[in-house]
């Protein structure tokens, strides 16, 4: 389907229709919002703290709570339903004072409430930067404090404040993250602890894999990161970690928001957009809907190019007491500039041209569409047991044209270029999972159990590959564009690029609570896989392999108290060696070539102060073995492939996010990452490409609170630092370090009793020229220039 902005009015019309039709019914519905809980059975005090973190309605009380064990709480409930279940037979009852205030009251022996002074005031700020106590990326394993791996969360309020343009933007305050080859600015490529590429399968949507090039959009609630090998839960992966983009879900409480946006890079490079978000109950039933519509149309910040993107995301949910079902669909159409950036000269420095000057042609872009279908079913089998089923199908298609730099003549100030393209590209992924989570007491010890089955079927296909030589050289000093036309010569030997992967897996984990302080965790995954890859007309298979693997995981946690814990863990990952491109000598990668294996040791500490700060300190050492290495045999003149390669990444990471006080919020991080090749005939000792040895960030927000009655003002600013990085695998040039600052301001007021929010964001405040990643010296990504954007949101 070709992108056309003419469909936007229709979509906006479709967006408004449900509000007109459903609002009268929704207003009659019970005014309650649904929250997702994953709390183990624990002392009532701890359970109420976790409840507050999940709902923003902290329970602060003056009476002495009975020393009882609250039941496990897993699933989706309103705050009232969840609190009722937690209180159980404690002898306490709840009473709501207002929308964010609850009161606990003792029930007398005669069943009457004791109305002695026990007022509960909400301590949890709706604008808090503190993340939830549990992350869905762990597939229902309980509080993050009990997990012997680093987990980072970019909370919903950070997303709202910083208005990230893509996943790279959203993760700037997570330690150990740098950008990799982002395919000309069209794909999310996140390097985690030194590992990752743009097809590594490490990005999830609601815990299920996706193939979309860009995964962050208006339907995003928050972003979660699990650091280190994650094959126990997510199968075939590099050992750096996985990322989970959590979607907004239907709510029973009626909410509508209409947003309009405007932006500028200066010099006439402007943009506009808008969005609509509506959710609520359908009549008096437990059904809830959500509809999100968004459109963006902006000029690219360099000398030509446009970015257009439209999103329609309807979803429907059944929110019963024991069973919750979510059915969601997401349709996206996009047009991106396909920009390979600038080039570096033989002196290891960028060419002496303005950062805005492109080295390609105006027809360099990518146009496509994607569709994502998702079904989730959660059923509470008993107080301590939850059954989960998930299914997703997602597909993306695109056509891309590009002019690529193939050489630089610095003496003449000219470039040689090729005219390339990809037509009829398609990626799809089908995934299904069933898991059971719960806890049981055996031998006097509590066991938190997780068992599951996964199935995945993924295909990446690139149809017609355009390859042809430019008609003439190009002056980068005095450029004249328009001398070339889009390529049309299909190279048969490069076309029909295909990569198929099918996997089936069984995983299990047991977390044993030895006492109130010690938790021992052990688990394993058994995975079978089939991978087939190749290219060409006629088709030539270059990978045809299958196999199976056991992947273990073990860890130990010592909880000093509810707020501080220490942990240690050992984890493994695996990833089959594969190649779409032909290998020298016609070698086919088969079952005789062992998969890459990652082994990681990690030590750390976690701080979690309800209503205040959440922090993680981690020390890690990851080794990836069986990396495919090409060895040229001078005697036979042939290249022999072996699993002799090895890389290592070790370092320290610190993350902190939350509230310093009622007025101050912050999110920040620091990482030291020493990543290098440890075994390779040519590259041994080299630093891994695009990985910074030092990186860090800090962003702070000051909330002025209520001004002029109900009005509210918040100001925030921050900066991120990324150190020097190797620009290629051979380490012949480096990308310089950089520091980039951002700022924002929000002002909230009332308009006829409706909330109105004005927000100003400034990206790259000081208009710093910087280089975010590189493929080689001819493809060096240039960071975006300063952008000023203003949005206005009306809630009704």
Which ranges hold each PLM region?
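Conserved C-terminal beta-signal and adjacent last beta-strands/turns
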Residues: 449, 568, 689-796
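Gram-negative outer-membrane beta-barrel transporters
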Residues: 621-623, 642-728
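Structural signature of Gram-negative outer-membrane beta-barrels, strongest in the C-terminal barrel
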Residues: 313, 317-319, 427, 446-458, ...
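Outer-membrane beta-barrel translocator/receptor signature
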Residues: 219-221, 232-314, 318-324, 371, ...
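Membrane-embedded beta-barrel scaffold of Gram-negative outer-membrane proteins
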Residues: 376-392, 396-404, 566-567, 595-659, ...
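Acidic, small-polar-rich N-terminal luminal/periplasmic segments of exported/outer-membrane proteins
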Residues: 53, 58, 72, 116-253, ...
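Surface-exposed extracellular loop regions of Gram-negative outer-membrane beta-barrel proteins
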Residues: 333-351, 457-462, 530, 557-602, ...
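Acidic/polar loop-and-plug regions of large Gram-negative outer-membrane beta-barrel proteins
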Residues: 296-300, 313-380, 393-427, 470-499, ...
